[in-house]
Swiss-Prot record:
Modified positions (Phosphoserine) in chain numbering: S69, S73
PTM (free text): Phosphorylated by CDC7 but not by CDK2.
Protein name stated in the entry: Cyclin-dependent kinase 2-interacting protein
Function: Component of the DNA replication complex, which interacts with two kinases, CDK2 and CDC7, thereby providing a functional and physical link between CDK2 and CDC7 during firing of the origins of replication. Regulates ATR-mediated checkpoint signaling in response to DNA damage. Part of the 55LCC heterohexameric ATPase complex which is chromatin-associated and promotes replisome proteostasis to maintain replication fork progression and genome stability. Required for replication fork progression, sister chromatid cohesion, and chromosome stability.
Species whose genome carries this gene: Mus musculus
Gene behind the chain: Cinp
Length: 212
């Protein structure tokens, strides 16, 4: 009878402690996924730059070869084009592999956001109509963890779509200035706002991964 009474007296503690631990793990996962994204994105920029440089190099050679139409130069042009096609294909495959890696990272980000939403729904069910909900850590309400996760997930989803577009267009672009624009967009990641990293750092502070 006594054990049953104890079980009824403290129903919330295990739920909240599990939720807090899960949110803390999620914050660490966000940190690690963004580090992996940045590393892979930098690698992708290097590969994309190589594709753009190869295109520019070929265009320069074609301009020179137009001035000469001898049989020897035509034969050399065919060999050059064959080497170019092989090199471009290898670089495009490398860039596609990087995009596949970024896609997997973004899918994991969406899963983190979904998990955080589930924690919010569990809390809503647990507290029902109660307006006073103590924070699991310092000051953040649980719903704010989901809001930050949702914003981050959406930002990286948009950035991923942009990178896929750049990857598809870059190898077919003959305009040097357009290639440079694509490379600039890849590097600066316009959909990932500067406050995204600030939100991540705030989440790490809130969950105790960073010292206050």
């Amino acid at each position: 009878m006594e054990a049953k009474t104890l079980g009824i007296a403290t129903p919330r503690k295990p739920v909240l402690s599990v939720s807090a631990r899960k949110l803390k793990d999620n914050a660490a996962d966000w940190h690690n996924l963004i580090l992996k994204w940045d590393s892979l994105s930098d690698k992708g920029f290097t590969t994309a730059s190589s594709i753009a440089n190869l295109k520019v190099s070929l265009l320069s050679k074609e301009k020179v070869e137009l001035e000469s139409s001898s049989p020897a130069s035509m034969e050399e042009e065919e060999k050059t084009n064959l080497d170019y096609d092989k090199g471009l294909e290898a670089l495009c495959e490398e860039l596609q592999a990087i995009l596949d890696g970024l896609t997997k990272i973004q899918m994991k980000m969406e899963k983190l956001s979904s998990t955080t939403k589930g924690i919010c729904e569990l809390e809503n069910y647990h507290y029902r109509e109660e307006s006073s909900r103590p924070p699991l850590f310092h000051t953040w309400p649980t719903a704010f963890f989901y809001e930050v996760s949702r914003r981050l997930s959406e930002a990286y989803k948009k950035e991923l779509l942009l990178k896929h577009t750049i990857g598809a267009e870059l190898a077919h672009t003959a305009d040097r200035n357009l290639s440079l624009t694509y490379l600039s967009m890849w590097l600066h990641q316009p959909y990932i706002e500067s406050n995204s990293k600030l939100q991540l750092e705030s989440m790490l502070l809130e969950t105790g991964h960073r010292a206050l």
